[in-house]
Amino acid sequence: MQENQELTKKEKYNIDKLQKRLRRNVGEAIADFNMIEEGDRIMVCLSGGKDSYTMLEILRNLQKSAPISFSLVAVNLDQKQPGFPEHILPAYLEQLGVEYKIVEENTYGIVKEKIPEGKTTCSLCSRLRRGILYRTATELGATKIALGHHRDDILQTLFLNMFYGGKMKGMPPKLMSDDGKHIVIRPLAYCREKDIERFSQAKGFPIIPCNLCGSQPNLQRQVIADMLRDWDKRYPGRIETMFSAMQNVVPSHLSDVNLFDFKGITHGSEVVDGGDLAFDREDIPLQPAGWQPEEEDARLDELRLNVVEVK
C-alpha cells in the first residue's frame, strides 16, 4: 500500500516537473516573440489531439499568473467526418469552464465531392479549414489565433522545404495570416513533442483520432519525422542544436543574394561575421549548442566514477 502511495507521489512529482518545463518553454516563446499582449483575446484552435489540449492547458495555467490580462476562447471545427465524437470536446470544455465555440461545417463532404477516390485530400481540406477559422476569429473578435504546432513540427517543415521545396523555410512562431487580417501564434514553438506526449498521457486528455477522414498520411513528412526521431535517439542534443541554428542565421555565410549584398563586396569592405576563414576549419563546440541533458541523466553522471582519476 505504502509502495503504491510512493509511486503516486513520484508520478505527481514527474507530472509537475513536466508541466513546469512546458510552462517555461511556452512562457519563453511568448516573451521572445511578443505573442500575447495586454487585453488580447486568444482563439485557441482545439482539434482534440495531444498538442492542442496541451496548449490550452498551459495557456490556462499561465493566464492565472501572467502579469498581463488576456482571455481565451477554444474553437473546434466539426468537419462532419464519419465517426467524429461530437460530445467529447463540449463535455471536456464545460467541465473546465472554458469559453468555447464548436463550428459545424461539412468540409468532409466538399472534399469527397471534389477530390477523386484514392487521392490525398489534405491540401483542399487545409485551405477550407483555414478560411473557416479566419472567419470565426473575426466573428469572435479574436486578436490572435493560437495553433498547436511544436518544435518538432517546425523542424520537420524546415527539412521538408529543404529536401523537396529547395528553400530554407520553416514554420514561424508568429506571423500575419496569408489573408493579412489575423496574427497567428504558436505558443508551443519551444516545446518538445516527447514532452507533450508524456504530459498528455499523464493528464489523460480525451484524445480524438486524427485519421477519421480516411486520408493517407503525408508520407514525406513521416519520413522526415522518423529521421529526426532516429537522430534524437542516436545523437542526443542534435535536435536542440538544429533548432538553435534556426535562431542564429548568418546570411553572409549562405548564398541568398536577396539577404546579403555579395555583389557589393569590394576592397575596404568591413569584415562581416568573422569573414571568410578560407582553408581554416571553423571551431565547433564539443557540446551541442542549445542542449542540456535531462535532469535524470545529469544526476546519473554525478554518480559515475571518474575512471581517469582513479589511482
Curated annotation (Swiss-Prot):
Co-factor: note: Binds 1 [4Fe-4S] cluster per subunit. The cluster is chelated by three Cys residues, the fourth Fe has a free coordination site that may bind a sulfur atom transferred from the persulfide of IscS.
Keywords: 4Fe-4S, ATP-binding, Cytoplasm, Iron, Iron-sulfur, Magnesium, Metal-binding, Nucleotide-binding, RNA-binding, Transferase, tRNA processing, tRNA-binding
Protein's pathway: tRNA modification
Pfam families per record: ATP_bind_3
Residues given in the record as [4Fe-4S] cluster binding sites: C122, C125, C213
Motif PP-loop motif, residue range(s) on this chain: 47-52
Any one annotated GO CC term: cytoplasm
GO biological process, one term: tRNA thio-modification
EC class of the enzyme, as a word: transferase
Enzyme Commission number(s) from the entry: 2.8.1.-
Cellular compartment(s): Cytoplasm
Domain of life (superkingdom): Bacteria
Cofactor(s), names only, from the UniProt record: Mg(2+); [4Fe-4S] cluster
Predominant subcellular localization, coarse grouping: cytoplasm
Keyword tRNA processing: yes
Catalysed conversion reaction: cytidine(32) in tRNA + S-sulfanyl-L-cysteinyl-[cysteine desulfurase] + AH2 + ATP = 2-thiocytidine(32) in tRNA + L-cysteinyl-[cysteine desulfurase] + A + AMP + diphosphate + H(+)
Signal sequence, start to end: none
Family: Belongs to the TtcA family.
Oligomer and partners: Homodimer.
Comment field (misc): The thiolation reaction likely consists of two steps: a first activation step by ATP to form an adenylated intermediate of the target base of tRNA, and a second nucleophilic substitution step of the sulfur (S) atom supplied by the hydrosulfide attached to the Fe-S cluster.
Name listed for the protein in its UniProt record: tRNA-cytidine(32) 2-sulfurtransferase
Organism: Klebsiella pneumoniae subsp. pneumoniae (strain ATCC 700721 / MGH 78578)
